[in-house]
Amino acid sequence: MNNSMINPSIVDLLKRVEDRYSLVILSAKRARQIIDGAETFVDVESNKPLTIAINEIDEGFVNYKDTEEK
């Protein structure tokens, strides 16, 4: 466990995605879905959509698929 004031930490979140850019896009899109009324998968004290989205990513409820051909 680290002493980060932010929970979950960026280090933990980056284990779930390819890079910081992907994390920003994924969390923003998920937050938008929550704003639009999507079901949430975690129980957190905050009612802020972005906080909920980040916690969902950290707990593995939200994934993404890289559609770019390499």
Curated annotation (Swiss-Prot):
EC number(s) on file: 2.7.7.6
Any one GO CC term of the record: DNA-directed RNA polymerase complex
Catalysed conversion reaction: RNA(n) + a ribonucleoside 5'-triphosphate = RNA(n+1) + diphosphate
Keyword match Transmembrane helix: no
The keyword Protein biosynthesis belongs to this UniProt entry's keyword annotation: no
Record key words, sorted: DNA-directed RNA polymerase, Nucleotidyltransferase, Transcription, Transferase
InterPro entries: DNA-dir_RNA_pol_omega, Pol_omega/Rpo6/RPB6, RPB6/omega-like_sf
Pfam families: RNA_pol_Rpb6
Enzyme class (EC, first level): transferase
GO molecular-function terms, A-Z: DNA binding; DNA-directed RNA polymerase activity
Family annotation (SMART domains): RNA_pol_Rpb6 (SM01409)
GO BP term, example: DNA-templated transcription
Family of the protein in this entry: Belongs to the RNA polymerase subunit omega family.
Oligomeric form and interacting partners: The RNAP catalytic core consists of 2 alpha, 1 beta, 1 beta' and 1 omega subunit. When a sigma factor is associated with the core the holoenzyme is formed, which can initiate transcription.
Biological role: Promotes RNA polymerase assembly. Latches the N- and C-terminal regions of the beta' subunit thereby facilitating its interaction with the beta and alpha subunits.
Protein name, as recorded: DNA-directed RNA polymerase subunit omega
Organism: Clostridium perfringens (strain 13 / Type A)
Species classification: Bacteria, Bacillati, Bacillota, Clostridia, Eubacteriales
Gene: rpoZ
